[in-house]
Structure formats: C-alpha cells, structure tokens
C-alpha cells in the first residue's frame, strides 16, 4: 500500500490516505488518482513512507522523506522531507533525523514520563 499526504497552506499536512499499489504504481499515478477521486485538480499531494522515521526505514528498506507524514506535519520541499510539529518551545530540531529533541534526554529506566516545559524536566507518571 502507498501512503500520500495532502498539503495545505504552508505545506502543512491536512490529511494522509492509503492507495493500493495497483493504482499507485508510482508517485505520479497515486497523485493523479487522488486528485480525480476528490475532484480537486489543484490539490497538492506528496507520497510518504509508513515505515520511515528519523531517516531510518524500520524494515531495512530505503528511507523516504525522513518521516512518515501525519496531520500538522510540515513538508519541507528543500529537504524533500516531512517534519513533525514542534511539541514544546524548548525542543530543537535534530538536523540528522528531522525529529525534535528535548533539552534533557528522556530517562531510560523503563518508567513512563511526561515532559514538563515549565521546569524543563521529565516528570514521572504515577499510576
């Protein structure tokens, strides 16, 4: 199955849909199918890879456009990549993965945490 992201103003993803590989034999065919399906000849669609995150293809294939697109992601046409929305003001974009990094690394002790933007800390989630 092929996945496509519909872009709105500012190249922000507004929708992600799946198209069967028999229809989307390549990116151009998938885009034309979606324009016809939605009767939106001027809409902008970009293919995205379900298996790509942080520039790594999780099944060992070739990474495609750095990250699988989601609603509110931005398509950067210079990088030819999808960038997720910035989760917090203090986080910075990792130029190698195009994912957002917190100013303090996530604890690796197996517990669940939430980011506390005010204190710039990871707060343990109590259950």
Located regions from the model:
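Interaction-interface detector
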Residues: 1-127
């Amino acid at each position: 199955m092929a996945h496509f992201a519909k872009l709105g103003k500012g190249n922000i993803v507004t929708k992600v849909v799946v198209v069967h590989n028999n229809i989307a034999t390549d990116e151009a065919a998938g885009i034309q199918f979606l324009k016809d399906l939605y009767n939106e000849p001027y809409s902008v669609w970009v293919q995205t890879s379900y298996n790509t995150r942080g520039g790594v293809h999780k099944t060992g294939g070739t990474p495609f456009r750095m990250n699988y697109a989601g609603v509110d992601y931005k398509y950067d046409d210079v990088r030819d990549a999808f960038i997720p929305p910035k989760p917090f003001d203090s986080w910075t974009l990792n130029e190698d993965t195009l994912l957002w990094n917190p100013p303090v690394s996530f604890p690796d002790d197996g517990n669940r945490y939430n980011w506390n933007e005010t204190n710039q800390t990871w707060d343990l989630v109590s259950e």
